Amino acid sequence: MRKKIVLTGGGTAGHVMVNVALIPKLKEQGWDIVYIGSHEGIEREIIGRIDGVPYYSVSTGKLRRYFDWKNFKDPFNVLKGVWQAYRLIQKEKPDIVFSKGGFVSVPVILGAWLNGVPSVIHESDLTPGLANKIAMPFATKICLTFPETKQHVNTDKAVYVGAVVREELKHGSAEQGRKLCQFDGQKPVLLAMGGSLGSKKINDALRASLPVLLSEFDIVHICGKGNVDTSLVGQKGYKQFEYVNEELPDLLALSDIVVSRAGANAIFELLALRKPMLLIPLSKAASRGDQILNARSFEKAGYAEVLMEEEVTNESLPAAIHRLYENKDRYKKNMEKSGSSDPLQTLLALIQNTAR
């Protein structure tokens, strides 16, 4: 009899990509897969491109750490989502639920617990996010990406697994990436990306620095939806994308160095690909500070250069990029020492062993 798994997670691409990595492997092992996400989150778009994975949506509320009148309404949306998730899980009868986190995951984990279905939570960041903190007491197992996270998760449910990286990222073609961007191959390539939602600060500083940077690099700029600067379309050596999906492996293969936010999934993918990186973590004013901890951990290990968001200027950004490129061989050498275990297989085995 075929086993069934419910996957959940959303809000940003980082809360979906581990699920995307799991789906082909789960299919190979004969699992039936169902996805529960939010009505309008980015997960709906990403999972909608994958054949054979039915998508259901539930109500949810954002878990804010600041005052907003929606804070009074959203708990009722979460309760509604718990009821919807409970009914969906009751109907689908999965053997296990796997959560990548994000606010949509809370009702789904609670719905699984109410149905007596085991669940596994995956925590990417060094310290747990608010949604995962709420869901952890109701989960069967908690998978960790950083070994240091055990200090912040006071439970024997926690298991260090490591970072799960999408297999297709390892098989990109630099030549295909070069054709896509129409670069001539005469300069090293800088890839800049500000996360699935984009980053105005990074976008603005990078564009202001183009006269300096284009003398040294060809630049691929993944700027976020609605953030393409039409005045720069056609600029030689500068290619903008709002968001990429199938093209990403080729663009990564093409790139010599990368400027990125410090979301855990993204930086571990860059580590697996041995890409020297300049990390610009989200500031504490705009987040809970998890990206700062992620970035500092990579800086300490010698994998990355770090530039704090409040330090980003039209002068500091190109200087940091130049410094990264000058030291790229040292960063690559440090990355080679990071090991080559297979967290994806470890996670698949844990899911198999935890399922009822």
From Swiss-Prot:
Any one of the GO CC terms: plasma membrane
NCBIfam families: murG (TIGR01133), PRK12446.1 (NF009102)
Signal peptide region: none
Top-rank lineage group of the source organism: Bacteria
A Pfam family it matches: Glyco_transf_28
Membrane topology term: Peripheral membrane protein
Single GO BP term: lipid glycosylation
An example Gene Ontology molecular-function term: undecaprenyldiphospho-muramoylpentapeptide beta-N-acetylglucosaminyltransferase activity
Pathway: Cell wall biogenesis; peptidoglycan biosynthesis
Protein name from the UniProt record: UDP-N-acetylglucosamine--N-acetylmuramyl-(pentapeptide) pyrophosphoryl-undecaprenol N-acetylglucosamine transferase
Annotated organism of origin: Geobacillus thermodenitrificans (strain NG80-2)
Catalytic activity: di-trans,octa-cis-undecaprenyl diphospho-N-acetyl-alpha-D-muramoyl-L-alanyl-D-glutamyl-meso-2,6-diaminopimeloyl-D-alanyl-D-alanine + UDP-N-acetyl-alpha-D-glucosamine = di-trans,octa-cis-undecaprenyl diphospho-[N-acetyl-alpha-D-glucosaminyl-(1->4)]-N-acetyl-alpha-D-muramoyl-L-alanyl-D-glutamyl-meso-2,6-diaminopimeloyl-D-alanyl-D-alanine + UDP + H(+)
Record key words, sorted: Cell cycle, Cell division, Cell membrane, Cell shape, Cell wall biogenesis/degradation, Glycosyltransferase, Membrane, Peptidoglycan synthesis, Transferase
InterPro entries the record matches: GlcNAc_MurG (IPR006009), Glyco_trans_28_C (IPR007235), GlycoTrans_28_N (IPR004276)
UniProt KW Zinc keyword: no
Subcellular location(s) per record: Cell membrane
Statement: the UniProt record of this protein carries the keyword Oxidoreductase: no
